[in-house]
Curated annotation (Swiss-Prot):
Family: Belongs to the class-II aminoacyl-tRNA synthetase family. Type-1 seryl-tRNA synthetase subfamily.
Keyword Cytoplasm attached: yes
Record's function text: Catalyzes the attachment of serine to tRNA(Ser). Is also able to aminoacylate tRNA(Sec) with serine, to form the misacylated tRNA L-seryl-tRNA(Sec), which will be further converted into selenocysteinyl-tRNA(Sec).
The reaction(s) this protein catalyses: tRNA(Ser) + L-serine + ATP = L-seryl-tRNA(Ser) + AMP + diphosphate + H(+); tRNA(Sec) + L-serine + ATP = L-seryl-tRNA(Sec) + AMP + diphosphate + H(+)
SUPFAM superfamilies from the UniProt entry: Class II aaRS and biotin synthetases, tRNA-binding arm
Signal peptide: none
Binding site for ATP: R260, K261, E262, E347, I348, S349, S350
Pathway: Aminoacyl-tRNA biosynthesis; selenocysteinyl-tRNA(Sec) biosynthesis; L-seryl-tRNA(Sec) from L-serine and tRNA(Sec): step 1/1
Binding sites annotated in the UniProt record for L-serine: T229, A230, E231, E283, S383
Lineage, highest ranks first: Bacteria, Pseudomonadati, Thermodesulfobacteriota, Desulfuromonadia, Geobacterales
One of the protein's GO biological processes: seryl-tRNA aminoacylation
Organism: Geobacter metallireducens (strain ATCC 53774 / DSM 7210 / GS-15)
Record-given protein name: Serine--tRNA ligase
Length: 423
């Protein structure tokens, strides 16, 4: 959520910057409600000043019978104040609802653009593998090895669900454990295991609600939603809290399954693991001081990149343009891994700085010291990594002509020493 004071005082510049995101971002309703709110406040405060002065005047009148007309007059003033206060509460509610629909302001360093075609490549690491044969897509490899069962996954639930079997299930588990070990033991994150369902307040805190309700799985008759990402529960760990400035940055990692309806993706990635209703992900979340949040974003990005480097997978980092960024982000880097069968890069991690946007929605603050005024923290997160897509990248990049798949060396201790997957 944007700071209403900053929005009010910098209305035109904020509106211009938000316009670079594309879409119908209008601030007219905010300006209308904010003006009405200030008008009501002025009226209410003026009447309260009159009432306070009258109260002092009445207290000085010794003959209380002479004070009755003034008391009756003040009853009318109090009734008007109550009406104004009620109106003000209604306007405050409407203003809050409007603020929840306004996206974050892109950081000045973010390139202006309309779509992913305008994203800026930052760097590449490694080289694509060279094959002496035509590389097969991961779904063919997985089915051929008997480790991915798409038909039975669909039978059990429906489209975009997969049954992992044997070495496929073990490889998924190996990746989760490898990522968590790397982030906790080397990068210094605290491991958490949050609930996989959260309430509406948590979804609102990170920005999924109210805008993206159609993409969420809601449990009928409850206030609970299945999480679309561990970002939601982990960021909300400190919702409504005041942290110690000396404790920042706080760095958390979590493995969770993620659940998404994938509304609007009909016909996209209909085969394989790229776009599923349920998938596993290891998430990285940071709570930082505003002055260090962009340095921490670079550190978080490097932590996510190291997963791919240790796995020996070629990738690139791109900086998203204003028109391709998520609703809550001020700046985002995507890490895209190379998939040889598709002859393209695919997103495997998105690393973002939200500045104080989520912290305002979730009331996450910190104090520099015991006497300091609380300030809003900055929140960051990124995938470290999407597990299913990492498995896809391993199957496609480490495939052999005979249909087997070599297991990256760093994963072999997690696979019981196994060096390859065969039929």
């Amino acid at each position: 959520m944007l700071d209403p004071k900053h929005l009010r005082e910098n209305f035109e510049s904020v509106e211009q910057r938000l316009a670079t995101r594309g879409g119908a971002v209008t601030l007219d309703r905010f300006r209308e409600l904010d003006s009405r709110r200030r008008e009501l406040l002025r009226e209410a405060e003026s009447l309260k000043a009159v009432r306070n002065a009258a109260s002092e005047e009445i207290s000085r009148i010794k003959d209380k019978s002479q004070a009755q007309p003034r008391i009756a007059e003040m009853r009318e003033v109090s009734a008007k104040i109550k009406v104004l206060d009620d109106d003000l509460r209604g306007v405050d509610d409407d203003l809050q609802a409007v603020l929840l629909t306004i996206p974050n302001i892109p950081h000045q360093s973010v390139p202006v653009g309309a779509s992913e075609a305008d994203n800026r490549e930052v760097r590449k690491w490694g080289e694509p593998p060279r094959f002496g044969f035509t590389p097969r897509p991961h779904w063919e490899i997985g089915e051929g090895l008997g480790i991915l069962d798409f038909e039975r996954g669909a039978k059990l639930t429906g489209a975009r669900f997969t049954l992992y079997r044997g070495a496929g299930a073990r490889l998924e588990r190996a990746l989760i454990n490898f990522m968590l070990d790397l982030h906790t033991e080397k990068h210094g994150y605290e491991e958490t295991l949050p609930p996989f369902m959260v309430n509406r307040e948590s979804m609102t805190g990170t920005g999924q609600l109210p805008k993206f309700e159609e993409d969420l799985f809601h449990l009928d008759g409850t206030d609970y939603y299945l999480i679309p990402t561990a970002e939601v529960p982990v960021t909300n760990i400190h919702r409504g809290e005041i942290l110690k400035g000396s404790d920042l940055p706080l760095s958390y990692t979590a493995y969770t399954p993620c659940f998404r309806k994938e509304a609007g993706s009909y016909g996209k990635d209909v085969r394989g693991l790229i776009r599923q209703h349920q998938f596993n992900k290891v998430e990285l979340v940071k709570f930082t001081h505003p002055s260090t949040s962009y340095a921490e974003l670079e550190r978080l990005l490097a932590n996510a990149e190291e997963v791919l480097r240790q796995l020996g997978l070629h990738y690139r980092v791109v900086e998203l343009c204003t028109g391709d960024m998520g609703f809550s982000a001020a700046k985002t880097y995507d890490i895209e891994v190379w998939l040889p069968a598709q002859d393209t890069y695919r997103e495997i991690s998105s690393c973002s700085n939200f500045e104080d946007f989520q912290a305002r929605r979730a009331s996450i603050r910190f104090r520099e010291d015991d006497k300091a005024k609380p300030e809003f923290a900055h929140t960051l997160n990124g995938s470290g990594l999407a597990v299913g897509r990492t498995l896809v990248a391993i199957l496609e990049n480490y495939q052999q002509e005979d249909g087997t798949v070599v297991i990256p060396e760093v994963l072999r201790p997690y696979m019981g020493g196994c060096s390859s997957i065969g039929r």
